[in-house]
Structures are given as structure tokens and as C-alpha cells.
Amino acid sequence: MGESILPILRKQVEYIYTIKFYKEKMDRAGVRPNDIRTLDDFTQLPFTSPVEMISELKKSPSSNSFYSESVTRINFSPSGKELYPIFHTNNDLERMHKVCSKTLTAAGLKQSDICAVTFGYHLFIAGLFYQGQLEAFGAKVIPLGPGESERAWKVINDYGVSVLISNPSFAVKLASKGLPTIRVLFVGGEPFSSVEGYAEKVREAFGRDITIIDSYSMALCMPVARSCQYESGLHIVDDFVYAEVVDPVTGLPVKPGEKGELVLTHLYKEAAPLLRYRTGDLTVIENKACSCGRSMTLPKGIIGRTDEMVKVKGVKFWPSQIGTILQGFSFATGNYRVVFKTKRGVDFVELFIEGSEYSSEDVEKLEHVLRRDTLVKFNEIIIVEKLELGPRVVDERNTMPS
């Protein structure tokens, strides 16, 4: 994409500068829209944190700088025990459906497909998000909603549903009873691409080689990335959102292929647009051409959270990656504890895993995947039947003698 995206970004920044929330942020940073002449200049714009974004959204409509008379839909998203609104204008919804239609074509959908959506349709956005894009695409849509697996299974089979939109775990539950007409499965709401062997597990439940489409979105930005029928990773929807990957500590861009925090900017959004929004999600972006026509790709989706980074053996390490990795190993319950120590002046890493009925091959594969995905060599991996309650991360390097 390169500098060709710059005119679009500049126009969006000019619009964003008319919003009080962003104008005050940019004025404090000493940056004006006319200062953005290159993509390097764009990185001088201030980041937007989830805390400040949500704080503004929670204000009443009369004092909320993101609310205007052009807003036509208000969904909600949870924040702790509270909710905050998600605003859309008609133009926002139309563009969202338009860019999603391209990804549906890339997924191999046809207008003749009958689709069933099992996500919620009330306050939250997921169900309506899929309903709207599928209708705009021209497919047939059944709004099943969540739960009630017996009724969902019956409707899917009675009406020859060919496309299922579901959490992967719910899809496996339905498939265990038999879903012979499904040819494409859209998964979301749970880690998938980042979990070793999950796709194979799902296909095994269906009993055949169905197409599986994974997506990454967040309530404030839908869509962000989606895989295609070639399953080469999750492609950034780059005609909707501009994605950066930065060092979580310095905020500086990382090199292509390096891990970092995903930062998002809407290209056209009118209501509550994001400007350099720090997602807190750890990922890698690779630029590789795919037969579907897109290139900016998250090869494994989201692989962890950036707010818990530690430096170990000279490597930046995010412990939450361990939990994601363990989901790909059936012998592990998912509970773990990683302990950092110092021995003879160097870092020593112990990993305790709760699990049972494992083989030496299982352990060897786990060691390989951990080293490959985290770049950290664990000195000891100890598997126990029951892990005592306690923190998942224990850093004893500053409390123990060398």
C-alpha cells in the first residue's frame, strides 16, 4: 500500500480534527492535519488509548463529542460491569457492508448460499454485523442467535444451510450431531488461527474439508481482518482500516514480521472514528501476496496481549502466548504458571502446566511450538495433574540471589 494511502489518511485526519476530543489531543501534541505530508509524519499523531476513548463514549449524548444527529445505530459493548455505546451513521453501515462483501467473495460465498448466524442480536453488534453484510452481499440469512443447539441443528439441516457463522466451539458441538450441508464456516469470538491444530479439530468434527474463515474485529472497529478461502492468514481489510504494528514500550514502528501492538485508524468512519488506537493486542503483520488479491496479513491472528510484556534472555516475551499455545494440546487443561529466576547470573525459566495423559512426543512438540512462537527457550517444563492456585506469572529475578 505504501504512500498511496496517504491522501485518504490526510482527508480522514482533517475530518477527525473537527471532533473536539481529537482536536484537543492533536493540539496538545502540536500536530495539525496540514503537517501530515508522509507516512512518517502520520506517526507523529498521538495514540488513542482504550481508556480515554471509552471514557468519552460513556458521556451523555449532550456532552459526548462522538455523538451527532447523523448517528442512526447505537450498539453497546461491555466495559467491566458497565456498557459503552458504539455509534454508526448510515454511511458507516453502508461502507462496512460494502467492504465485507469483498471479503465474502474472497471466502467463496455465493448469493445462492443460505447462511445461519448464531451470534447475539440484542445490544451487542456481532449478529447484526454479519446479518447486514450477508444481506448486502445478496445471500439468504437466518438469524438463529446464540444457544438452543437442538433447534439450531434442526433449522440448519431442515433448510440446507450451507454457511454457518458461529463460535468454533459451538460449531463443533453442532457438527458432532451431523451437519452435511455446511461448506463454509465463519468462526469468531474465540481464539482460532493462533491455536495450533484447532482447524484440524473442527474439520474432524465436520468429517470433511470445509472452508473455515477466521476474523478479527473489535466492537469499535468492524471489520479489521478476515481470512479467505485460500487460508493464508487473516488479511487486513485495508480499504476500511489502516493498521500499524508498534513496539508496546517505545511506541515506535517495528520491522515487518516482528511482533508488536496492533494500532488502528479508520479510513472513512464518521461516528466515533479511531485514530492510532492502541488495541493492546499482540500480533505480527506480513506483506505477502495472496490469490484473493490482498497482501497485508496477520498470519496467526492475535497471539497475546501487550500489557504484560517481560524481557527474558534478551527477548521480549508475552506470557499470555502460553495460554493460546496450550489450547492446541489436548492433554493440557490450559492452566499454567511461568516462573522467572536467575541462576549463575542468567535468566532461568520454569513452566508449570496442568495436564495428564501425555506422551514424550506431546512434550517435544510443545517445546518446539513454545520455542518457535515465543522465541524463548524454557529451561524446565513441568507437567502436574493439579496446579495450585496462584499467579500465572512469577518473576523472582529481583528477589532471589544469583
Give, region by region, the residue ranges found by the protein language model.
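Nucleotide 5′-phosphate-binding alpha/beta core
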Residues: 1-98, 102-106, 110, 345-352, ...
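Short, surface-exposed charged micro-motifs
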Residues: 14, 242, 282, 337-341, ...
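Active-site phosphate/ATP/adenylate-binding loop shared across adenylate-forming ligases
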Residues: 49-213, 221, 225-227, 232-233, ...
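Short, solvent-exposed loop/turn motifs
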Residues: 82-83, 253, 278, 316
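Conserved beta-strand termini and adjacent loop/short-helix elements that scaffold enzyme active sites
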Residues: 144, 215-217, 246, 341, ...
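AMP-binding/adenylate-forming catalytic core of the ANL superfamily
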Residues: 164, 268-374, 378
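Conserved AMP-binding/adenylate-forming
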Residues: 194, 198-289
